[in-house]
Amino acid sequence: MPRYLSLVRVQENTIDMADADPGFEARMGALFEEITKAGVMLDTAGLRPTAESSRLTWSDGKVSVTDGPFTETKEVVGGYALLQCKDRAEAMEWSRRFLAVHPPHWTVGLEVREVEEMPGA
């Protein structure tokens, strides 16, 4: 069964958990319980701020390192979910449901990509 990586895209420093509506955490918990019981959710987590991260780049045969925060970047990956679904349509439906539990005044995006499986793995 194919796996899909859902990358949560946010504008860093624009989402404040204190700004969430009172039912947000309960809605998210219920969705996570449902998706886990369905055997779809393999792993998920939020990511620490870019101020605590580094970017490594390979160019001209050398590795360069840039420490965050990355002020030139509007959107960053704020979290991820690894899903195992029967097809892309199912991955998209779970992703739509994930977005729908968020407060309406937040802007959150998802990039859903199928994991390329290695032959023989």
Language-model features and meaning:
Residues 1-121:
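Conserved, structured core segments of small domains
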